[in-house]
């Protein structure tokens, strides 16, 4: 049967796989692989045919010993042909290479190809067998050349030695080798394929190996290749489990009865890599099967995964504990909430117990749930991280709040000071633009000459009127109020309270408590009182209390009187001269910028049209203003595209703005060209903030001027590329980061000069003031007839005065004076009672001023009449 044909054995339906396995056993072929699995039918048939072809039945009289020696010399498994070896699958191929003692790994640690492994197997099988070691007679009969070769193989120094010495040294060396070497050569199946060198492995493979040994992903990301190698070497890997024997027949054949072996050490039951790849629940079940009750003073419920692995390795390894790192106590902040949520409840419970958990939320550890354990762990880590409590300063006492408005008058003066109710408003969050955008968007506006340096101890100022006679809103309440009058000179403030002498024109103040209004950014620590001066200085940043004047809404200013900024694109500054950067706008210190701009625009006769702040606000504001004021429709995409097209075809337009276009500071032509392209590319992207260069380009394209109302300076500024352009497009500008559209409140705006005269301290009434001259009859008949004497006039004295007036007063004819009709602007509809009360509060002090002026005029009329 062993002389079966290969084709019949492989493909005949007469024989099943079981029959082929039995046939292989009968013919002396092992049908099992080293791992215990059966070989494929094709491999078994090939080995049977090869076995029969190499050892055919012989009729010659050969001894049984010679047959046995021939069988031992020829290995049927390793004698497989390369063609048949290449057809094997990966599992059988690896088993074949390991069985035949062939290196299946490259020096870099990678697996060799199937073709390379098969070639190595065939070469090893076809290599000549090792000869017997020469005996003493062979050494005597050996020629000197062969003696030298043999000495060289045995690492014997053969130089300067004669033949007898070489024979003696070789014989001595061979005897020592025979005494150390085992009595028989090891079986081929005992040779193990060398493991890949860890130094030659790639970082990706090292990470996978370290992860299998229990390293976390977070730890692996921070480790380089050398640290990975150190970590893998520090984790002592347990040896592989016992390999299954190929077959019972081979097992019996390998153990000869006459030869005794030394007892090999017991191999461990568990491998560290296998245990670390299992879950905690599976490890606990294995530990219970091994009889776990307590380990390292911990019960199974308190043990972590590493404790369970150490226990199983200790039990299965014959009492030898591998060098695995002990469980580290959690640090101050071991894991985040998300990482803790990935852990199992037993692990969380063990971690919480390590932090000293006894009772949490009136529950014992056995009653707590997963979220409770996570809360306790995070709370414990926060306590360990929290610094010692610091001494906190007590909050400042708030200043008194005034619920109503009162009038404070002086002893000798008829002037009145308004006490304003101060309410704290939260600051509206404002986005701060990037430095590059902030620099490029700032219009060239110099700082106001009236800006005063801030002192360390600011005191209260009298409220200073701007060119509209109104006070800008603010958001900070003063701590201790005081009154500071108007003064044209700028004086540094002192750190201590001081009282300054009154000017000759100032009237004495009463000793009643003074109140000031809000300060925009700081709280005064010490009050100071200053006299009132008749002159009025320009508005400063710190508003204070002042006598209010009637709210007369001035019309928008005449753009012809405003300074326009004209740029000639043909003028190019020399490349050697570096242009100085223009000053930044003064920082806005108000509370709500949008609300303040609405108030400022309403005083100037404009209405604010909100614009979406998405980076396209400049183009959106220009488009809205064109549609509302000039009835021209443009979308913000169209305007941006026109700017990009114009700058692409007129790159010389950007030459006057080298400092804003050049980012690197280099003004060479090559660098300038790169920066121009970069600037145009950035502006072409939707959402990129526009700047004043875009405004000038739009002015040139649309042939218009832009009247920019800047909140920081509270003034208009005309931006244009040519003074000859007539249409004026109003825009609002907030704190160097946002543009809005404006539309006039009046149908025909009245031109007003930019340099407006200061608002008088006593606002004009709708009636003309009376012209009063003593001893001359008034031109206007008094409201009380002379025949009816008022109660405030004393009776006529009984003694006739000796002096008589030179001009006898006469009654004025009953002709009504010609009073011009009042002019009222458009009335804004009120939406709530609150707005009505606010308007009434604004008018109230002015009405009282008018009444007091009328009372004084009446008194002077009576005095002039001698009454």
From Swiss-Prot:
This is Putative ubiquitin thioesterase L96. SUPFAM superfamilies: Cysteine proteinases. PROSITE patterns: OTU. It comes from Tipula iridescent virus. The active site is at residues 614, 617, 738. Pfam families: OTU (PF02338). GO terms for biological process: DNA-templated transcription termination; protein deubiquitination; proteolysis. Keywords: DNA-binding, Hydrolase, Protease, Repeat, Thiol protease, Ubl conjugation pathway, Viral genome packaging, Viral release from host cell. Residues 606-745 form the OTU domain. It comes from the Viruses. Residues 582-591 have a biased composition (Basic and acidic residues). Residues 565-575 have a biased composition (Polar residues). Residues 49-73, 177-204, 231-271, 379-591 are annotated as: Disordered.
